[in-house]
Amino acid sequence: MRKKNLIFFGLLFFGLAANAQNKILDPVDYVNPLMGTQSVHSLSNGNTYPAIARPWGMNFWTPQTGEMGDGWIYTYTAEKIRGFKQTHQPSPWMNDYGQFSIMPVTGKLVFTEQERASWFSHKAEIVKPYYYSVYLADYDVTTEITTTERAAHFQITFPENEQSSIVIDAFDKGSYIKIIPSENKIIGYTTRNSEGVPDNFKNYFVLLFDKPFATNYTWHDKILEKNKLELTNDHVGAVVGF
């Protein structure tokens, strides 16, 4: 996987270099989505997060440094990323709804938001309105995200190792997860919200992978269950290995 990624980016670089003299910068490349992210509850200024999305897109995606339920999803001074989160949050004071997260890990299997968090550096982070990339130092993993009108494409580059996994966190206050190994698919829903939604509110999601699952786990709270493919509880998630 890593070799293929290096070849792809090498060809891309060659193409850009060959056309450098005719390059026209798209206005969107002037946008810095990190502006306003150096804010916390005690000093509420900016109050933004790096939203990766299409204009008028159904869903936004963002790296998550704050804990689940923290309106300050991403804080510039934070040192660790806990996941990559689907979000609809308009303001930290209003908080979020329709939210879940994805996080790659390697080595020892960890899945809670405290254990799975990885150190990162802004020097190894690329942030555009249409693209996000970051190197997760604890796992030697690079995560890339770009979006469509209603979905997102992830490319995750793992190192060569015995255990590479992806953690899906459907968050608390009522959630559901199901792994479908025969289709390389995970489905589920999350109900976590901050009021102002119908009583039967659910945010459904479907995750499709381009590689088969070598291992399957579901989890609730801090309990991990191997080969149990479906789970409903207050706070559930899944872990699939490759």
Task: List the predicted regions and their residue ranges.
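Bacterial Sec-dependent N-terminal signal peptides
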Residues: 1-22
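Accessory carbohydrate-recognition regions in carbohydrate-active enzymes
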Residues: 21-242
